[in-house]
Amino acid sequence: MNKDELRILQVGDVLVSPNIITEKFCCDLDACKGECCIEGDAGAPVSLDEIMEIENMLDVVWEDLSASAQAVIDKQGVAYTDIEGDLVTSIVNGKDCVFTCYQDLKDMNDGHTIQNCCLCALERAYREGKSKFMKPISCALYPIRAKHFGNGVYGLNYNQWKICKAAVKKGEELNLPVYKFLEGPLVKRF
């Protein structure tokens, strides 16, 4: 079947955009250095439960946050309602998520160092065993965006963003569909 002929798929109460099945994707931190956490006009979508989890671990990650991020959190909290009416993580200077932090990172495949990579302070605390909460599920699912339509029905769309061109190329090289790349977070959420 031609991928242009595919229509929205329904899996239980989840409507799945066909390009989640047909398109390829694999994050390439060498190329983007975590740019999805520092670009955009709003923070990552969060639930009230996630906001509580984040607030409970602020003491754990506080020193990893920039002074600007700390000031934003002191002023408005860890989240706000964006122009579309969604709860999202707070951002610094209209773009950077308040939970971004930077460090050199060893590539898991060949061990080379990726310099000055943007990471999530929440996820780093989780990986260091300091927290049971990893990060908002919307971050773990990226580049898939989930939308709740009500009555338990969700829609999943593949968000194609120019900063992820290298991830698309790497996914094509590995022949790795979006849904396979995100299998863990998809299973956890749905």
Residue ranges: model-predicted function:
Residues M1-F190:
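Short loop/turn segments that flank or connect secondary-structure elements
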